[in-house]
């Protein structure tokens, strides 16, 4: 096989908010080991999940490049991430980092280190978890009766559309009313059969604006799309 690596995001995957269980993570590690494939694990949202399963890296540490970040789990302004790599990949990772980024900002790295050691980072993680749960509660209230997928500790909602609704048209109608959502096809990676859906982000806005925006989406979904478009 020409496959040299597999990319996984097992915790609250963007966009469907799925959480991979420990057994599945272990199975992926076993298959990668059998075929000598590297694993790139994106766990930038993982710390937001309480009692989440061990990362894939825990099952295959000798071949997993583990990526995480402060940006999604503490504050957006702390733009720094970390990559933990097995010994055999360290030289290649360091070389690629020098070519693409040269170095992280030392002050930002120092702040991140201090926050980890003095407990500030975990305080912010707990705050983010609570904020996301409030926003997911709002989504559950406004989207009641609508087919969607989410987790209480997730940043997104994956909203299923009727089979005859075009994603692009639905997204355009929402945008005309001041609501930005993403078409599901933006995340499609194969030609397999596809059910129309959109991704809704619950961040980057106030809770009041979120409630209003979700209300617009619900009306678009449950109402007559042609009537709603003409009424704008």
Identify the residue ranges that each predicted region occupies:
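Short, conserved charged micro-motifs
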Residues: 165-171, 207-212
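PLP-dependent enzyme catalytic core of the Aspartate aminotransferase-like
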Residues: 176, 191-232
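Active-site phosphate-binding strand-loop segment of PLP-dependent enzymes
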Residues: 1-49, 228
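Active-site PLP attachment segment
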Residues: 58-92, 104-107
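Short hydrophobic/aromatic beta-strand micro-patches
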Residues: 84, 158-160, 201-203
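Conserved glycine-rich beta-strand-loop-beta hairpin in the small C-terminal domain of fold type I
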Residues: 129-140, 148-160, 170
